[in-house]
Amino acid sequence: MSASWADVADSEKAVSQSKPPYVPPHLRNRPSEPVAAPLPQNDHAGYGGQPAGSRWAPPSSGGGGASGGGYRNDGGRTGYGYGAGGGGGGGGGWNNRSGGWDRREREVNPFGDDAELEPVFTEQENTGINFDAYEDIPVETSGGDVPPPVNTFADIDLGDALNLNIRRCKYVRPTPVQRHAIPILLAERDLMACAQTGSGKTAAFCFPIISGIMKDQHVERPRGSRAVYPFAVILSPTRELACQIHDEAKKFSYQTGVKVVVAYGGTPIHQQLRELERGCDILVATPGRLNDLLERARVSMQMIRFLALDEADRMLDMGFEPQIRKIVEQMDMPPRGVRQTMLFSATFPSQIQRLAADFMSNYIFLAVGRVGSSTDLITQRVEFVQESDKRSHLMDLLHAQRETQDKQSLTLVFVETKRGADTLENWLCMNEFPATSIHGDRTQQEREVALRSFKTGRTPILVATDVAARGLDIPHVAHVVNFDLPNDIDDYVHRIGRTGRAGKSGIATAFFNENNAQLARSLAELMQEANQEVPEWLTRYASRASFGGGKKRSGGRFGGRDFRREGSYSRGGGGGGGGGGSDYYGGGGYGGGGYGGAPSGGYGAGVTSAWD
């Protein structure tokens, strides 16, 4: 009699119950592990999350969150997550002030692990000035109720986390610009600061900004918008300087809960948008890219409390005035007097001060003498070289430098044109001098590769246009060569400021010929002021320039003086209607509606405002 299908099924079930479960070969002979209890589930939390209403999930549960959460919820929108809620807890998500993950726990350490933290922080110790030799560096301040300077960082209430980072940086004491600028900014005053290159200007404005944001981190941002709402924006004229400020600000803000993001042109915008979506308290940007983000409605200026312009005179002088004015006055940025504005640069000519004053309210002008950048630290040489002899003269300098300086020493060569930079780079490489170049026509990736190659010493000669002259902190630059002198003495000051940094000595060599005659007077004055030896032939050129109306350098030992203290700036009403007194341009004193009585605040008869 044949067995039924039910009997066959029962017999197979009995056999299967008598067989041990199959174990793969690589797992055999191992002790069995206890089975983990199932994770709690509920209708309101994500996978493994806490019940709704709890702000934090325990570390062992793997996160999750209640409804309203998400990967990031700056504006109340739902992001990524499992279950009915999302990635964040409570009403939050990543970077939400009222809930979600603590960004400090998830922050990537920019310095590696703790063992590597200390050496990285000690790379730059009080860059720019030999403090023991320059205790008497001249400082001028003007404006009402100027806060007194401080002598140590311990005298300043910046917050525990920021003070810890300052100690990690081995910043023993504030630089002259920091001693005066930080108390002014902590007092919530607007500031226009003029200080030498390499004097610590970046830290001077970053410390108060980070400290101010740390103290008010409970402030809620608007909800229901795709835009991010930073509390501070720092504008820079070049991509390289923006990246440098970003790196420094990230170091200062480490473990403070303050998120710093950089945005600049020349690269695809998508990666920068992703960084912004992860949260942004401080936005470092170039004017063009920031305008792009504002027009896309991906960034809002509505919550801005701090506006900083680094190398402000360069931005205004390079033609960024319309873009900056649009950002500051035509978007939703709070007006001056509500936000705090700070402008920093190594030079502030009076014309630029007049423009910058439109952004500020009852500001303090701070001028720190540039003694440390031009006396003992930098030896300035001016050599008469005809155009046709410049290459051979440069080769002689480089050969002599090879014999006298160590392998770490770098040489920065400035030229006037982009084509000249490429041509000189190729010529140096053909003559067995490893060189690279940066200028405005190179892509951002090419510029970053060139700078990295130069900083590491793989190509110890960098040929550059003025794009590299402003603000960049490149260590070990022993020699700056002005292959082509600039047309303006302020650009010369910025160029030679690339050497003599971090308390190290440097050499600045300039090739001068008849084409540079208009610079002779100001160049001779600068060298005399710095106790440098002025060649007799340069003195003769300078005297000719004096008779011919050559340009006189303003500001003396400083990069500029407060134009409000000049005789041309008088707040009387007698110049109204363009008829009173005589201003800087000879077009009428300041009275009535503006400079020279112009009803719209112009600069007097015959002078076109840069804002027009």
UniProtKB/Swiss-Prot annotation:
Biased composition of type Basic and acidic residues is found at: 559-568
Residues with the N-acetylserine modification: S2
Q: Where is motif Q motif found?
A: 151-179
The cellular component terms of Gene Ontology attached to this UniProt record, alphabetical and capped at eight, are:
cytosol; nucleolus; peroxisome
Enzyme class (EC, first level):
hydrolase
Instruction: Report domain Helicase C-terminal positions.
Output: 377-542
Annotated catalysed reactions: ATP + H2O = ADP + phosphate + H(+)
EC number, as in UniProt: 3.6.4.13
Keywords in alphabetical order: Acetylation, ATP-binding, Helicase, Hydrolase, Nucleotide-binding, RNA-binding
Bias (Gly residues): 61-70, 83-94, 570-583
Annotated Helicase ATP-binding domain ranges read 182-366
Return any one Pfam family short name. Answer: DEAD
Region annotated Disordered, chain positions: 1-70, 83-104, 547-583
GO terms assigned for molecular function: ATP binding; ATP hydrolysis activity; mRNA binding; RNA helicase activity
The UniProt annotation puts motif DEAD box at 310-313
SUPFAM superfamilies, sorted: P-loop containing nucleoside triphosphate hydrolases (SSF52540)
Positions with a binding annotation for ATP: A195, Q196, T197, G198, S199, G200, K201, T202
Q: Which PANTHER family does this one have?
A: ATP-DEPENDENT RNA HELICASE DBP3
Q: Which family does it belong to?
A: Belongs to the DEAD box helicase family. DDX3/DED1 subfamily.
> What does the entry's free-text domain comment contain?
The Q motif is unique to and characteristic of the DEAD box family of RNA helicases and controls ATP binding and hydrolysis.
Q: What is this protein called?
A: DEAD-box ATP-dependent RNA helicase 11
